[in-house]
Amino acid sequence: MPKKPRANRPSGTTPVAPLLPKRIGAGDVVADLTRTMRAQAPEEQAQALIDQAWEARTQRQAAALARRALEIFPDCADAYNVLAGAEARSAEDALVLYEHGVDAGRRTLGNAFFDEHRGHFWGMIETRPYLRARRGLADCLWALGRKRESITHCEALLELSPDDNQGIRHG
């Protein structure tokens, strides 16, 4: 019996389809993200939400993401930073939120961390939420006329990051 003629494919080649990756749908992407979120520590999950909050189109969306981050990880300092910017209606309101952020950041990093890494904070990504909260706190204190307290926080920030990456000296 004669063989079937091949399609117009040069001899020795294989069809392309088996080499292509399997197509995935939106449902697969969501399932992968869900599995990834479950595998992350609560602190990482919360920070992922904060990363979205920084990019949110509205203050309301940013605040909702920050609140969700706090439900997952109550010591998420950046959540308080987002809320201070998104929800505070006065310097007093922002002050309270920044104080919570500073406290949360200190608990997350731990006292030994401060002693060990003093002078090198800015170079360590995990310190940035704390540094942002403390700078926000200093700015609020200054705005409220509590200059001496503000300066104390600024001096502490400069001890942690002497290169003044936050522009404390010029703020």
Range-by-range predicted roles:
Residues 1-117, 134, 141-163, 170-171:
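N-terminal alpha-helical interaction modules that lie
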Residues 122-139:
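Extended HEAT/HEAT-like alpha-solenoid repeat tracts in very large eukaryotic scaffold/adaptor proteins
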